[in-house]
Every structure is written in C-alpha cells, then in structure tokens.
Amino acid sequence: MHKGEMTVDVVCFPHTLATFPMFTMAAQATFLSIAHQKKLRCERFLNEMDRIIPWQQMLDVMRPHYYDNAVGRPAKDMKLMLKIYFLQQWNDLSDPAMEEAIYDRCSFQKFLQIDLLSDTVPDETTILNFRHLLEEHRLQEQLFAIVNALLAQKGYLMKKGTIVDATLIAAPSSTKNREGKRDPEMHQTKKGNQWYFGMKGHIGVDADSGVVHSVAGTAANIHDRVMLHTLLHGSEKAIFGDQGYACDGDKDACRRNGEIHWFVSDRGRRNHPLSNGQRKKNRKRSSVRSKVEHPFHVIKNLWKHTKVRYRGIAKNTLQLYALFALANLYMKRRQLLA
C-alpha cells in the first residue's frame, strides 16, 4: 500500500433476503395489510359519501341541461357521469387519469356500479364534455346550493355568524406551454417573504357549524378585505376574520348598526403596535376562527387540491363550488349517517 492511500474494509453478505423466509413473509404480510387497510378506507369513504349525497335533487337540477339523445349516440347515464366527476374532485384526477383509474381500481368500479365485462367505461372525451356541460350552465353553484339547503334543513347551518378567510391556490408559472405564456388571469402575491403565483379561494363559513356557505375566486393579488361583503349572507350577528380583513370603515359601520358584532383581529401599524389588550382579544378570536381551516384542510390536504387544474378564474372557481359542496357533506357525514 502506498503512503497516503486509504484502506476500505469490504464486508460481504453471502446471504440474500431470500434466505430469510421469515423476514420476507413478514414484510409481505405488512405491505399487504397496509394495502388492504387503504382499500377498506377508500371503500368506506365512497360508501358513506354515496349514502349522504342528495343524488335525486342534484339530478333534477341537471336534467333540463343534459343531452336529450335526439341525435347521435345515446348519452351516458347522468348519475354515472356525476359520480365520475365527484371521484375526480376527491382524488385530484385529470380526465385521462380518471378513465384509467376506473379500469384499475375496484373501489371505483363498485362505487360507479360498473362491470368491466359488460359495461362500457366513459372515455376521457366523454368525461371532458360532461365537465364542460356543468361549466356552461354553472351547475356546480347549484349543486353547492342543494347541499347547503339540505344542511340547513337538518339544522347544521345556523347563519348567526360568519368566519371569512382565503387560501392561495398555485398556478403554473412556466411559459413552456402551448400558448407560450402564463395564464393572464392568474397573478402573483407576496405572503411573508415568499412570492406565489396563482389564484385565491375565498370562503364564508358558518361560525357555529363550520359549514361553508359562500365561495368566491379571484386572482392572487386581490386583497382579502375586498371580498369581505361578497362572503357575507346578510343575516350575520357576528363577523370573524384575521388581520387581512381589518378595516376601520367596516368596523365603524358595524358599531353604528348595533346588531352586528365585529370580531375581526386588530392589525398593528407602523409606530402603532398592538396593545396587550388587543393581542389578548386577537388570541381569543383566533380560537373561533380556526373553524375556517377545516374545509381548507379537507380540499387541500385530504383531496390534494393545491394547484389549479384549468386556465382562467371562472372554471377554477366553479370547481371550488363543487369541492366545498362535497367538503360540507364530508365534514357532516357522521351526523347525516346517524
């Protein structure tokens, strides 16, 4: 060995994992168990949602706009197509990925009541055309209204107070696409020390139940405060929001009204920091305001809707109506199933 050279000890393992059948069998059993548990959770979720979604009311609203089969091939069953659309929302699937998933996932076939041996699976073009039909007639807004009417009837939408909030939804910032440019309706905004490009989803949430009653979509550079009145239903006795909604004019208007309590967190200003009393009030208000995070958690963390799927604010806002309609049902599923 020459001076300065390193020595490396090589340890050889003459046996592979295959020589340890107990180990491999245990590992396989673990993987199978995890896969089985995941399948059971998916099937349970789909079964519960199938039972609580007001299918008949939704189909009645859609029927006047659906294909009448006067010419061309017979249209696919309306309920089947609506179920496929909902599967896309729950799993963040594109139209081609949705078609493929129907073939691959038994839980989807069971939910859709499709037999691959005898039934024809809708292709990606059929799935796309159905979504365009929903968008053309803004049916997602009507589906949202149907869900909230059901929840109000059951006593889960009190309308005594509203919590307002917004979330950023990212859009592709690259220009490497067919048009060679970014979506002109999307814009950038700064949050903390980081810049984001995309849109905002704004919601008004029932302060008692946490149910979303108002939805709006804007470019990311629109200030939260601008959307406040759009998110109110008009019968509130209290308004909750973070510092982004702080506005002396609105606060004074509530005081003059005398019937609406303003619980929006106070904002500190340059040379005018918050007092200890204001900080204490803000902490107390944030405990109520946390309910607005639940629907965002459902659509962004559970259903992975963190990026826009379409170009333009309008189409993505309509998708938000569908997502929050389903999120409302999901959050109240135990009560609805009881």
Which sequence ranges carry the predicted segments?
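Helix-centered, glycine/charged polyanion-binding patches within enzymatic domains
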Residues: 27-29, 237-238, 243-314, 318
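Alpha-helical support elements that line or immediately flank enzyme active sites
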Residues: 80-92
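Charged, often Cys/His-bearing segments associated with DNA-binding zinc-finger transcription factors
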Residues: 1-56, 63-64, 338
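Polybasic low-complexity intrinsically disordered regions
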Residues: 13, 29, 87, 96, ...
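An N-terminal domain-cap segment
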Residues: 59-79
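A short glycine/serine-rich beta->alpha loop
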Residues: 67-72, 116, 310-313
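Secondary-structure capping and boundary motifs in well-ordered enzyme cores
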Residues: 51-54, 73-80, 118-122, 284, ...
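A short, flexible helix-boundary coil/loop motif
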Residues: 302, 336-338
